[in-house]
UniProtKB/Swiss-Prot annotation:
<dbReference type="GO" id="GO:0005840">
    <property type="term" value="C:ribosome"/>
</dbReference>
<dbReference type="GO" id="GO:0006412">
    <property type="term" value="P:translation"/>
</dbReference>
<dbReference type="InterPro" id="IPR027486">
    <property type="entry name" value="Ribosomal_uS10_dom"/>
</dbReference>
<dbReference type="InterPro" id="IPR036838">
    <property type="entry name" value="Ribosomal_uS10_dom_sf"/>
</dbReference>
<dbReference type="Pfam" id="PF00338">
    <property type="entry name" value="Ribosomal_S10"/>
</dbReference>
<comment type="similarity">
    <text>Belongs to the universal ribosomal protein uS10 family.</text>
</comment>
<dbReference type="InterPro" id="IPR018268">
    <property type="entry name" value="Ribosomal_uS10_CS"/>
</dbReference>
<dbReference type="InterPro" id="IPR001848">
    <property type="entry name" value="Ribosomal_uS10"/>
</dbReference>
<protein>
    <recommendedName>
        <fullName>Small ribosomal subunit protein uS10</fullName>
    </recommendedName>
</protein>
<dbReference type="GO" id="GO:0003735">
    <property type="term" value="F:structural constituent of ribosome"/>
</dbReference>
<comment type="function">
    <text>Involved in the binding of tRNA to the ribosomes.</text>
</comment>
<dbReference type="GO" id="GO:1990904">
    <property type="term" value="C:ribonucleoprotein complex"/>
</dbReference>
<keyword id="KW-0687">Ribonucleoprotein</keyword>
<keyword id="KW-0689">Ribosomal protein</keyword>
<comment type="subunit">
    <text>Part of the 30S ribosomal subunit.</text>
</comment>
<dbReference type="GO" id="GO:0000049">
    <property type="term" value="F:tRNA binding"/>
</dbReference>
Length: 102
């Protein structure tokens, strides 16, 4: 019997919401009898945007904004049908992007 694995990648701008969501997924998977590896923190993506402060000239006066994308990886090993059903019903915050691979 081949071993199955569900790989879940989570992305969010707020690390606190991301960690709460990862904890909910881990608790749900463990409660239904699956083995869990993670959450593994992946490198944070940092996008920096530089704009001119003045609308016309003054090129030396600039302002920088950044947005950080935090990421986590969770592997669920040997999931049961009960695990998959519980993960589908799980309610997570709206600021978290979830990517699931079987």
């Amino acid at each position: 019997m081949p071993k199955q694995k569900i790989r879940i990648r989570l992305k969010a701008f707020d690390h606190a919401i991301l960690d709460q969501s990862a904890q909910k997924i881990v608790e749900t998977a463990k409660r239904t009898g699956a083995e869990v590896s993670g959450p593994i923190p992946l490198p944070t993506e940092k996008d920096i945007i530089t704009i001119l402060r003045a609308p016309h000239k003054y090129k030396d006066s600039r302002e920088q904004f950044e947005i950080r994308t935090h990421k986590r990886l969770i592997d669920i090993l040997n999931p049961t049908p009960k695990t998959v059903d519980a993960l589908m019903r799980l309610d997570l915050p709206s600021g978290v992007d979830i990517e699931i691979k079987l």
